[in-house]
From Swiss-Prot:
UniProt source species: Natronomonas pharaonis
Ligand binding (heme): H84
Protein name: Succinate dehydrogenase hydrophobic membrane anchor subunit
A single BP term in Gene Ontology: tricarboxylic acid cycle
Entry keyword annotation includes Transport: yes
Location (main, coarse): membrane
Bilayer-crossing regions: 26-46, 72-93, 104-128
A GO cellular component annotation in the UniProt record: plasma membrane
Amino acid sequence: MSQSYDRGLVEDFGRWQEFSAGMWAWIFHKFTGWVLIGYLFTHVAVLSTATVDAATYTQTLQGLESLLVVRFLEVGLLAVAVFHILNGIRLLFVDLGVGLEAQDKAFYAALIVTAAITVASIPTFLMGAF
């Protein structure tokens, strides 16, 4: 006979406000990792049109680049990739024992650098879209 696990109050949704920077770094790293995996499948699907012929591949790329939403998704992809890389480097240093006392600061620095790179790249990605 098994007993069910008592998880306590399910409606205790306010716990996320108590998360530390390390928990947010873990959540964002997992989320960005899944987004990058999803992008990888999409990227392979688009590249597979090149196996048909060059004209189909060119037509697919031109069709995607003409959509404004794709331009914004590219900016989001850059933000996801930059954060994932910077947080991965932060985790590498933490695993090596470097900067253990400054983990929170390193996480916030990764967020700030990601935001700066993303904002600086917006004109490049949206050039010619309007």
